[in-house]
């Protein structure tokens, strides 16, 4: 496979500048042509723009983007659905002779795409039945049911994690096996390419995250959440749990005063920092990643370094 038809994944923690690097790289590819494929789970949702730092259309420099705004907030985002859709987008871009640039920080989504995971079956009717049961008895009782059926799965899933509890019970019912036995099977790398990782010093990134959080609230995150509540956000299994959105919903439920919103802002910042630690831990385990320092290099140098690594895949 020549470099001209290799995907170029750009991964890394939240707030490191992956989207801007992707745009810079795409512009440098010039005549080859490039299209960007989103790998941020929450940017899949229509209307979730400010809180996910989704690039506005007029900031995308005319470069086609895929896997943005493909779900309503009431729909459940799943790794399996994303994998199928994003892989199809990438193959279509490659078939047209252009370069797919995969950009995001959602760990499972990225790995399932790059490493061709195979997922256990799903059945909407079985899922719906367990979700109804969740609504009737609550996540605590449902988790207790999971513990009776599969103690190992219950030990691995937080008692407050309704989505994973429902999924585990669905898989157990469909397969008749423990949940762990039906875990996604990791296949060989789907494409022969390099993975570019973008990170920077923790102190610098913390400062960026603080500014990013403040900017989201100042640019209208509360109004965005309020509008999405009118479109069913509260009923969304995954969308309502997104960082920033969950905190604002809780603040509005508590009265929506200045103090509640101040706490929501602080909780969003703290939650984002925790998420960054998880991202770093996950991505650092993958020794295929070529890491670039976003704090030590100018944007042009970062783009040059990313393209140099991509063009010289061994």
Swiss-Prot record:
ATP binds at residues 12-19. Its EC number is 2.5.1.75. GO terms for molecular function: ATP binding; tRNA dimethylallyltransferase activity. It catalyses: adenosine(37) in tRNA + dimethylallyl diphosphate = N(6)-dimethylallyladenosine(37) in tRNA + diphosphate. Keywords: ATP-binding, Magnesium, Nucleotide-binding, Transferase, tRNA processing. It holds the Pfam family IPPT. The record marks 106, 127 as: Interaction with substrate tRNA. The keyword Magnesium applies. The keyword Glycosyltransferase does not apply. It comes from the Bacteria. InterPro entries: Dimethylallyltransferase (IPR039657), IPT (IPR018022), P-loop_NTPase (IPR027417). Substrate binds at residues 14-19. It is an enzyme of class 2 (transferase). GO terms for biological process: tRNA modification. Its cofactor is Mg(2+). Monomer. HAMAP family: IPP_trans (MF_00185). NCBIfam families: miaA. Catalyzes the transfer of a dimethylallyl group onto the adenine at position 37 in tRNAs that read codons beginning with uridine, leading to the formation of N6-(dimethylallyl)adenosine (i(6)A). Belongs to the IPP transferase family. This is tRNA dimethylallyltransferase. It comes from Mycolicibacterium paratuberculosis (strain ATCC BAA-968 / K-10).
């Amino acid at each position: 496979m020549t470099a001209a038809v290799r995907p170029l994944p750009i991964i890394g923690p939240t707030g490191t500048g992956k989207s801007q690097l992707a745009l810079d790289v795409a512009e440098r590819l010039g005549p080859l042509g490039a299209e960007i494929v989103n790998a941020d789970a929450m940017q899949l949702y229509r209307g979730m723009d400010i809180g996910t730092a989704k690039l506005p259309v007029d900031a995308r420099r005319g470069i086609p983007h895929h896997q943005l705004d493909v779900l309503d907030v009431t729909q459940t985002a799943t790794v399996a659905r994303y994998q199928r859709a994003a892989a199809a987008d990438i193959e279509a871009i490659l078939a047209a002779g252009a370069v797919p640039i995969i950009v995001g920080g959602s760990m499972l989504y990225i790995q399932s795409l790059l490493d061709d995971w195979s997922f256990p079956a799903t059945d909407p009717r079985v899922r719906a039945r367990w979700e109804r049961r969740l609504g009737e008895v609550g996540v605590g009782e449902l988790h207790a049911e999971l513990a009776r059926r599969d103690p190992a799965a219950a030990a691995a899933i937080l008692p407050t994690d309704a989505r994973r509890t429902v999924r585990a019970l669905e898989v157990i019912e469909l397969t008749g096996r423990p949940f762990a036995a039906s875990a996604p099977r990791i296949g060989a790398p789907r494409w022969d390419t390099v993975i570019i990782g973008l990170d920077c010093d923790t102190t610098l990134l913390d400062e960026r995250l603080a500014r990013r959080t403040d900017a989201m609230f100042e640019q209208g995150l509360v109004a965005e959440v309020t509008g999405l509540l009118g479109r069913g956000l509260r009923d969304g299994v995954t969308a309502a749990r997104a960082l920033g959105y969950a905190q604002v919903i809780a603040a509005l439920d508590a009265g929506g005063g200045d103090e509640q919103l101040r706490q929501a802002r602080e909780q969003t910042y703290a939650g984002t920092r925790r998420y960054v630690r998880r991202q770093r831990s996950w991505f650092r385990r993958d020794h295929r990643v070529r890491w670039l320092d976003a704090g030590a290099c100018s944007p042009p140098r970062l783009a040059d370094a990313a393209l140099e690594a991509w063009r010289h895949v061994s």
